[in-house]
């Protein structure tokens, strides 16, 4: 599967703006920390060059943001959709939550996103985070120099149990589309069934506290 880099996506975003296909692009920009990436709307190539970021911490799902963004009378908005994002996009579209004609959807492949909590468990005193060409995490620490963490050991749980690498809706697809996976995600159900009532309550309390009602789980 083709690996999508930050430069590749940034150039695509500028191409969409310069060609007039869209008037703005949903992307990611850095927050206070290297792992604190947040959705942002880009309207110029200069803004993209200055602020656009794409790496293993870009787990944010843009689909829900389209509900409000497409209500603006400001032309078409382009959005990058990972396979899991495309499921929530499809569900929200089915529920008529946004105007499809106002969106240019670009499907992108994804090999899984990084869980900052797993990185924190592996190293202390994080000063700077970057990724190598294979997606492994390079951590500069305050106390113990630099550490390299295997991306597969620090992946988000939902990515470990990913149900599909296939984008189900798009106007343009970058790279090759993936496949629906025959994974072992129901192993997690067995773990839940083995929990006590209090443990299950605590588990779902933690899961639902992060819910943004993107509706990907309903598709």
Model-derived regions: residue spans:
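Iron-sulfur-associated redox domains of electron-transfer enzymes in respiratory
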Residues: 1-208, 218
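Helix-loop elements that line ligand-binding/catalytic pockets
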Residues: 212
């Amino acid at each position: 599967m083709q690996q999508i880099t930050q430069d590749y996506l940034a150039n695509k975003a500028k191409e969409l703006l310069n060609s007039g296909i869209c008037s703005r692009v949903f992307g990611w920009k850095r927050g206070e920390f290297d792992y604190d990436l947040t959705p942002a709307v880009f309207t110029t190539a200069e803004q993209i060059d200055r602020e656009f970021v794409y790496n293993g911490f870009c787990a944010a799902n843009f689909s829900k943001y389209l509900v409000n963004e497409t209500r603006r009378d400001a032309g078409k908005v382009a959005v990058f959709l990972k396979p899991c994002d495309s499921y929530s996009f499809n569900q929200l579209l089915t529920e008529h939550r946004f105007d499809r004609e106002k969106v240019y959807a670009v499907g992108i492949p994804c090999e899984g996103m990084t869980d900052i909590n797993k990185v924190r468990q592996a190293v202390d005193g994080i000063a700077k985070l970057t990724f190598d060409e294979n997606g492994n995490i390079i951590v500069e620490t305050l106390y113990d120099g630099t550490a390299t963490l295997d991306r597969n050991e620090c992946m988000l749980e939902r990515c470990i149990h990913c149900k599909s690498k296939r984008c189900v809706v798009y106007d343009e697809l970058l790279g090759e589309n993936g496949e629906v996976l025959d994974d072992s995600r129901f192993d997690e159900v067995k773990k839940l069934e083995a929990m006590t009532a209090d443990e299950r309550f605590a588990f779902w309390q933690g899961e639902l506290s992060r819910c943004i009602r993107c509706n990907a789980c309903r598709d």
